[in-house]
UniProtKB/Swiss-Prot annotation:
Species of origin: Thermotoga maritima (strain ATCC 43589 / DSM 3109 / JCM 10099 / NBRC 100826 / MSB8)
Species classification: Bacteria, Thermotogati, Thermotogota, Thermotogae, Thermotogales
Domain of life: Bacteria
GO BP annotations, alphabetical order: regulation of DNA-templated transcription
Record-given protein name: UPF0150 protein TM_1321
Family classification: Belongs to the UPF0150 family.
Length: 72
């Protein structure tokens, strides 16, 4: 069965690395030197965690990403 998970990827200018995580699944986070690498790493880690956890993962159907504007 195929499932789609939401991943969040940010660029860290201090380390010059992309940092990725899947909020729905504890333990799924990784880094990569490019977007392609971090995507590949996230998929690999996610597959390993899901294989280990079996049906214990509570997959969320919706995750919101909001832009919040503030005065600075």
């Amino acid at each position: 069965m195929r499932k789609i998970f939401t991943a969040i990827i940010e660029y860290d200018p201090e380390t010059k690395q992309y940092v990725g995580m899947v909020p729905d699944v504890p333990g799924v986070h990784t880094v990569g030197s490019s977007l392609e690498e971090v995507r590949r790493n996230l998929k690999e880690v996610l597959e390993l965690v899901l294989e280990e956890a079996g049906d214990e993962i509570n997959h969320q159907e919706f995750v919101a990403l909001e832009m919040i504007e503030v005065e600075t």
